[in-house]
Amino acid sequence: QATDLINCHSHMTYTMIKERHAEKTNFVPHSLPGNLFYKMHVEEITMHRSNLLGEDRKDHFVGIWVNRNAKRKRPSDLLVSWSLFLQNLEKMHGHRNATLIMHTEPEDTEGPNLFKVVEELNIQENVFFSRDRIEFEKMNVLYNISDFCINTSYAEGFGLSTLEAMMTGTPIIAPKTGGLTRQVVDHNNGTHNGVALDIDFKTMVGSQTVPYIYEDYVQSENFATAMMSIHELSKKEKNALSRKVKKYASEEFSHQATIDLWHNTMIKTISDFKNRENWQIEEI
């Protein structure tokens, strides 16, 4: 009751809180300025693919994962999924022409040693690590040269990298959990902005500080299948999907709309504010 305004970036959070505090709870979508992430010209994308991945990988099917190397993000499970996808790709098409960009620190103390995981799975030639902290302009390039962006987390409040990718027209693969659901599923018609994955199983965990919380898991095989479904799209289908996700991101996560919602809800809160009596502490 001590809070006068609750603005939620995640629609899932909004639906939960409004049940108890409907009068002061609003959905204010996350957003980013439109000049940070945008669709580049085909010629530029081709040039950057050659420069970053090498001439031998410029025509590869490219995926990108942008997260901290930490347990919740499931980086090792992502690599298992990628390995399964490569095996399926070789069976279906006779090659392994695909590269996964992992924008993360492979030796982060919060996560596994990803160099060792890649080595164990024997996929060294199909994983590209982007370890440096880079400017928005360079991140925009990474999203543009990718055919999909994936999030594999078992819990995600929002999932910023998938929105950034959608702003460039890159489709996403994500589990239907937390704030990711509103991104990967078009709430207007139920269609997907890439591949939305059902949760295969839930676990309930917790601590003395957080009594309980659910973790949502998708099996590696299903992530691999999702990757293949993007790979198998025709050029026409890929272009149509790219236009769809870019349009959805610009309309549903409009930066100006977010600014206006923050402004209007704060103005309303101030105008509706009622003075309350100060609390008094009495010894009994």
Predicted feature locations:
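A short, active-site helix/loop in glycosyltransferases that binds the activated sugar's phosphate group
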Residues: 2-27, 32-40, 113
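Short hydrophobic beta-strand element within catalytic cores of glycosyltransferases
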Residues: 171-174, 184-185, 192-196
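Nucleotide-activated donor-binding/catalytic signature segment of Leloir-type glycosyltransferases, i.e.
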Residues: 111-137
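Conserved donor-binding/catalytic core segment of Leloir-type glycosyltransferases
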Residues: 54-73, 79-82
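A short helix/loop element that forms part of the nucleotide-sugar donor recognition site in Leloir-type
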Residues: 38-56
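C-terminal amphipathic helix plus adjacent low-complexity
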Residues: 205-216, 220-284
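Glycosyltransferase donor-sugar binding loop
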Residues: 94-114, 132
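Aromatic "clamp/platform" in nucleotide-sugar-dependent glycosyltransferases that forms part
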Residues: 154
